[in-house]
Amino acid sequence: MMVLRMKVEWYLDFVDLNYEPGRDELIVEYYFEPNGVSPEEAAGRIASESSIGTWTTLWKLPEMAKRSMAKVFYLEKHGEGYIAKIAYPLTLFEEGSLVQLFSAVAGNVFGMKALKNLRLLDFHPPYEYLRHFKGPQFGVQGIREFMGVKDRPLTATVPKPKMGWSVEEYAEIAYELWSGGIDLLKDDENFTSFPFNRFEERVRKLYRVRDRVEAETGETKEYLINITGPVNIMEKRAEMVANEGGQYVMIDIVVAGWSALQYMREVTEDLGLAIHAHRAMHAAFTRNPRHGITMLALAKAARMIGVDQIHTGTAVGKMAGNYEEIKRINDFLLSKWEHIRPVFPVASGGLHPGLMPELIRLFGKDLVIQAGGGVMGHPDGPRAGAKALRDAIDAAIEGVDLDEKAKSSPELKKSLREVGLSKAKVGVQH
């Protein structure tokens, strides 16, 4: 007996430029460059592979699969490629799992031969998906409250060189930096636990030093201690921090991964700890403007999961990026977004006191300003470098010229003599 089967046409079935996405669909924006196929077919292949598809034509399609097909509803030429917007039914996504979302929309699609380049530009989750994520435990307002800093950027620094310090040496530097006015002492991305500086010894010593400085200065000080490692080790390290009275942990979120970050968001909530998100390794896929994933998409995912602050760039300094891109990321992190609290953007990379007026003019006061070499390289030492940074920030907030402020701040005066004032031009790639 012959069974009649209807052949299911593929790829172009995923393209409907007259389609209007529903309120409960997740929208993803891509830039892509076709490789030997039409733009419509390339876009359809992206939608297919990231939703229900396979490389071959099928003879049967389950009813749920039909209802779960992604739809390309926008397709326009852009530079050497095209911009596509794709609507995804929520039946494709597991609730509360960034891992599963990224495996779909940023997974196998990047390996397709039909594409020369593919870049995930942004994604827009509907509330029905977003409601399964907690977002930051503290966010900008919560951090300002426990730090006691109401109307200026927070200051942070990393002891330089970033490796090689014994626990005692690190503690001595921490005392000088905190005493000079730094709010947040930060480990660097690769500084975790070593024979010359064990995490367990460092966590005990540094919080004793912090308590001493707080008593001497009357200011709240915190330590962004790097707990990154296998997730079971991260959990133990977070518990040590909480037991010592710490308020923060730092995680290298890209190398740790979304799964580890989501798990640690639950752990840190139980322990009452804020998460400082370092983005080490992000440039492996954010830097190429024609391929990879944007920093905006990473920052959005990190905010959904619940980091309290995250590095985004400076537009000035050695790690400078494009001003418009960084401003867009920062504006998103600070915006109202359903129940998800705002996140502190962190500016870092080649910053020094002379850049403070320009940096604050560009990005405002809701910012964590991290200066490493720009503080540690002060000719009179790290305490003087810390004071110079604080004085420069105070001047910028008060609208006072740095040269004028330097008349009453010998530390700032000497710093400006060493590194000068900002000469940065903004709005272009630096």
UniProtKB/Swiss-Prot annotation:
The record marks K318 as: Transition state stabilizer. Transmembrane segments: none annotated. It is an enzyme of class 4 (lyase). InterPro entries: RuBisCO, RuBisCO_III, RuBisCO_lsu_C, RuBisCO_lsu_C_sf, RuBisCO_lsu_fd_N, RuBisCO_lsu_N_sf. GO terms for molecular function: magnesium ion binding; oxidoreductase activity; ribulose-bisphosphate carboxylase activity. Substrate binds at K162, R279, H311, S348, G349, G350, Q370, A371, G372, G373. Binds 1 Mg(2+) ion per subunit. GO terms for biological process: AMP catabolic process; carbon fixation. This is Ribulose bisphosphate carboxylase.
